[in-house]
Every structure is written in C-alpha cells, then in structure tokens.
Amino acid sequence: MSSTPRQVDRGVVVFGAGGQVGRAVVTEARRRGLAVTAAVRDPERHRDLAGEGVSLVRCDVTDPAAVAATAHGHTAAVSTVYTPDVPSTDFYGATADALVAGLGTARVRRLVHVGVATTLETAPGTAVHDDPAFPEAYRAFSLGHALALDRLRESDAALDWVVVTPPLDLDRAAPGTGRYRTGGPQVLGERIAQADLAVAVVDELTAPAHHREQIAVAE
C-alpha cells in the first residue's frame, strides 16, 4: 500500500453500483465512512441502494457527458459495469472511452476498474482467453474487457487508473477476511471472497498502491 494515504474527502462515484460487485464496493466504502454516489442505469430497480451516505443517480456510462456530470465533485471513481444488452466489445470499448473522457472533464484523477480473470496472463503475452480450448461463449466478454484495458493504457497520463482483477472463482457467499494478495497481470490464485475483492478496490481508493496497471488479487 501507499505510504501516503489519500484522503477521499469528496467521496467516490461507483459506476455499475447495482451489480453484485458494485454493491459490495458500496458497502465496503460506506463501512469506512466514505460518501458514495451509486451510479446505475435504472435507479428504480436499485432504490434499496439509497441511504445514509449513499446518493443514487442515473448514468449512462457510455456517454462521456453523463460520466462527467456524475463524477463532478468526487475524488475518485470505481467501474464495475456490465450489461448483457450490448455486444461486450462495443460496450466495454465505449465505456472505457467515456470514462477516460468524462473523468478528464470532471478532473477526477483516480479510477479503479474491476476486470475479469480471463484477461490475466498464463505466460508473457498470453491471456487465459488465448487458449484454443477457451469456451467460445465467453470469449467476446473477455475480449471486451481486454479492449477496455487497452483503452486505459492509451489514455492520458493524468488519469491514474488501476484494473483490479479477481480470480475465476469470485465467491459471493463467503464471508470476508479483510485479507488478500496482490500480484502483476498474471494468474495469481484460484479464489477470492467478493467482500475481500471490495476491500482491495476500496484500498486502491484510500491508499493507492498501483498506478496505470492491471493487477491480480486473490485470497
């Protein structure tokens, strides 16, 4: 972790807050006393998110202007977005472009993006999804995340991003331990509790330790 913790004094916006990982991040951020803006496509479906310290807003994360308006006044942003309604390469490419542009306009410098395990390397330059035996049904989803990572790498150096990538087994039911390991963009382990993934994400908000890179996390 960073030796000089960052004070997230203006709160954090969580794009994709209505999903399971997004909700876990909101819960962990509030546990630490952070003010949270929960950005979702349809607030009516996620009214339970609103509460003390949590503002619920509508945002199209593929629209740079909407991202900028939503992120304005915040210290940092988290992206846990997903949709089954748009091809993954289109959605994640557009999302990354909108986040880069919108956060730049809003002058939000820190972005923590949650990635997927299949983009991690099994050998230098070879991702899990490059294996010929990788299921074709999941390839487009993984390639969409890989495209988003490429767009972040191409972004202006002013955006301090990190892609936090859990293992394939993201255990949503397991109790959190508050502990996790980190590594580079290689497969690190087999499992992590969703609650501990959220801890790792919020740690990268409050005490940024990784900058403009993909990392793996595992139990």
Q: Model-derived features: where do they sit?
A:
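N-terminal Rossmann NAD(P)H-binding glycine-rich loop of SDR-like oxidoreductase domains
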Residues: R10-R32
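Conserved Rossmann-fold cofactor-binding substructure of NAD(P)-dependent oxidoreductases
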Residues: S55-H74
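NAD(P)-cofactor binding segment of oxidoreductase domains
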Residues: P84-L111, L147
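Glycine/proline-rich active-site loop of Rossmann-fold NAD(P)-dependent oxidoreductases
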Residues: E121, A157, A173-G178, E204-E213
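Conserved beta-loop-beta element that borders a ligand/cofactor-binding pocket
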Residues: D150-R172
